[in-house]
C-alpha cells in the first residue's frame, strides 16, 4: 500500500463515520500539501547540489534579470519581500563565492549597489540550463493538456483562496 492509498483509507474511514464528510475535498487538500512538500524538497535538493538555497537563487535571478545586473540591497529586498537583514546575509555569502560584488552607488556615496560578477553570470546561466532540464523531467510526466489544465486549476484555486482569506 503506497502513501496515497493509506491517506485515502484514513479519510475514507472519516467518511464512513459521517456520510456528509467532504472526502474528495479532504483528499485533494492532502494531495496538494504532499505534492507541494515533495516539490519543495526536490527543489531544495537540486539547488543544494549547487551549494545554494532557494533564497540565494532568488537573489541571483533577480540580479540576473535586472538592468546592468545591478541593484541596491533595498531594491532586492523590496522585489523579493525579504528583510534587509536577510539580503545582507545572502549578499555576504554570494560575495564570498565571488558571484556578486558590492560597489558604491553613483547617485549616493553612502549607498551600496550589488552587482553580479562574470562568475555569477556564468553560474546562473549554468544553473538555469540545468534547471530547464530538471523542470522538463518533472513536468514531462504530464501531457501538455494535463499541464495546461493543472495551471488553470491552480490559478483558479489560488484566486479563490485569496478571496476566502480576505
Curated annotation (Swiss-Prot):
SUPFAM superfamilies, alphabetized: Winged helix' DNA-binding domain
Gene Ontology CC: cytoplasm
Source organism, top-level taxon: Bacteria
Annotated keywords: Cytoplasm, DNA-binding, Transcription, Transcription regulation
Coiled-coil region list: none
Localization, UniProt: Cytoplasm
UniProt name for this protein: HTH-type transcriptional regulator PrsX
Keyword ATP-binding: no
Record Pfam families: MarR
Gene3D superfamilies hit by this protein: Winged helix-like DNA-binding domain superfamily/Winged helix DNA-binding domain
Domain HTH marR-type: 25-159
Keyword Isomerase: no
GO MF, one example: DNA binding
Alphabetized InterPro entries for the sequence: HTH_MarR-typ, Tscrpt_reg_MarR-type_CS, WH-like_DNA-bd_sf, WH_DNA-bd_sf
Amino acid at each position: 500500500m503506497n502513501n496515497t492509498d493509506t491517506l485515502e483509507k484514513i479519510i475514507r474511514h472519516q467518511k464512513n463515520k459521517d456520510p456528509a464528510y467532504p472526502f474528495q475535498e479532504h483528499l485533494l487538500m492532502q494531495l496538494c500539501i504532499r505534492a507541494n512538500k515533495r516539490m519543495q524538497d526536490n527543489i531544495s535538493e537540486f539547488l543544494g547540489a549547487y551549494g545554494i538555497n532557494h533564497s540565494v537563487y532568488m537573489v541571483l535571478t533577480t540580479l540576473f534579470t535586472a538592468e546592468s545586473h545591478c541593484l541596491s540591497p533595498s531594491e532586492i529586498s523590496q522585489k523579493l519581500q525579504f528583510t534587509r537583514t536577510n539580503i545582507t546575509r545572502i549578499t555576504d555569502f554570494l560575495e564570498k563565492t565571488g558571484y556578486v560584488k558590492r560597489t558604491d552607488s553613483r547617485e549616493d556615496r553612502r549607498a551600496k549597489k550589488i552587482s553580479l560578477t562574470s562568475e555569477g553570470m556564468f553560474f546562473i546561466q549554468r544553473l538555469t540550463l540545468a534547471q530547464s532540464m530538471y523542470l522538463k523531467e518533472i513536468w514531462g510526466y504530464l501531457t501538455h493538456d494535463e499541464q495546461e489544465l493543472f495551471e488553470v486549476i491552480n490559478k483558479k484555486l489560488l484566486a479563490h483562496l485569496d478571496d476566502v482569506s480576505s
